[in-house]
Amino acid sequence: EYHGNISIGLLAARANLEGPIIKDRSSFNVSVRRTWMELITWPLMTAVNKKADTEWKGGYHFYDMNAKVDYSFTDRSRAYLSFYMGSDSYRNGEDSKDIHGEDRDFRWRWGNLIGSAGWNYLINRKLFATFTGGYTRYRSHIIQKQNAFVSSPDKNGQVYFQEGHYRSAMEDVNLRASFDYRPNVDHRIRMGSDYLFHLFR
């Protein structure tokens, strides 16, 4: 049986859907979310800019999505896949209505991407194994722009322009194998191996 819902709020909306793919064997769950703050602030900025000496521009919004799929091979063997993606965007700047004024613009976009997979297997009544793998990524991009009219002694003037970009990212890859062994009700042994790779740029 499929289930879903949609929620609409003042600043954001979200939706969710879940249900079976193969009856009694696999299922899925997907959810999304998105803000619309920029749709609310845009009319306000338009009204303010009509009476101001500078035209302000800016806003913020984000979205994200989650998805997961489960699959049961047997009563002793299960696997899953999961995924997440999210992004944020921010902007702030102003344009002067005077030709001799100053314009500036600042933009920042950042987000995450995460993917993982796992397999759980009951080897026997005393030994349980779990194998997982995952990938994560974070990215950030900043843009700064500025231009201005600079007067000079000859009164001709010059236009000064500057633009800068800054990018950064972090990525991780993770692999893990773990075992849970219970020889009897009074003893428990856990063992395994883990690999983690970091990349910065």
What is the predicted role of each segment?
Residues 1-72, 80-84:
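Predominantly transmembrane beta-strands of Gram-negative outer membrane beta-barrel pores used
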Residues 12-15, 27-32, 50-56, 94, ...:
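Short, surface-exposed linear patches
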Residues 70-88, 109-201:
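Face-selective signature of the C-terminal outer-membrane beta-barrel domain
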Residues 1, 5-16, 22-24, 29-30, ...:
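Well-ordered, non-transmembrane segments within structured domains
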Residues 1, 40-52, 91-101, 110, ...:
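Flexible, solvent-exposed coil segments and beta strand-coil junctions
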Residues 13, 37-39, 51, 88-90, ...:
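Sequence/structural signature of outer-membrane beta-barrel proteins
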